[in-house]
Amino acid sequence: MTAKEPVAGLDQPFSSDDATATPWADARQQLDKAEVYWLSTVRPDGRPHVTPLVSVWMDDSLYFVTGNSERKADNLAQNSYCIITTGCNRLSEALDLVVEGDAAMVSDHAVLKRVSERFGAKYDSPFRFKVPDFAAYGEGGKNLVYQVAPKRAFAYGRGAQYSATRYRF
């Protein structure tokens, strides 16, 4: 699948004078290799909800798994718009990423199989999922798989220079 190349722009007021925009290829690579992500959703009463989770980057999207009775699943059923972040808490050398988009539940068997394989390749147990575990496959399935294709994204670089890059898709 061909990678979507967003329009990248440096937010100069939030960047060092000599900073350059972070190339999307660098951001995409970090989205692929990160191990822990944070999902932000909105509760039905309007309060925010943030939770850590694991995710994989595949087909220009982030994919994550959640139990069908978890708070994030309930929130996404009411409002699919979400934000996924990843990065680190070091001030010296880091690249923090923010991805905004709609979380779409995945039910296509071939895609679920590929997501399962990607999780298995990236994470050790207990983050291995088999396709029959997914709720799309009946009563026994307890897990929902969501795909978030970026609508907007941001990269915040820290180190010798500080940069704030905005990506528009």
Name the predicted role of every residue range.
Residues 24, 69-70:
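Structural motif corresponding to alpha-helix initiation and N-cap regions
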Residues 31-32, 77-78, 120:
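Alpha-helix boundary recognition
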Residues 34-68, 74-76, 82-87, 95-99:
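Short beta-strand segments
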Residues 70-72, 91, 162-163:
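Short, surface-exposed beta-strand-loop junctions and turns on beta-sheet-rich folds
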Residues 1-21, 95-169:
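Charged, gly/pro-rich active-site loop segments
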Residues 45-47, 90-92, 136-140:
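A short beta-turn/loop motif at secondary-structure boundaries
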Residues 10-38:
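Short, basic/aromatic recognition patches
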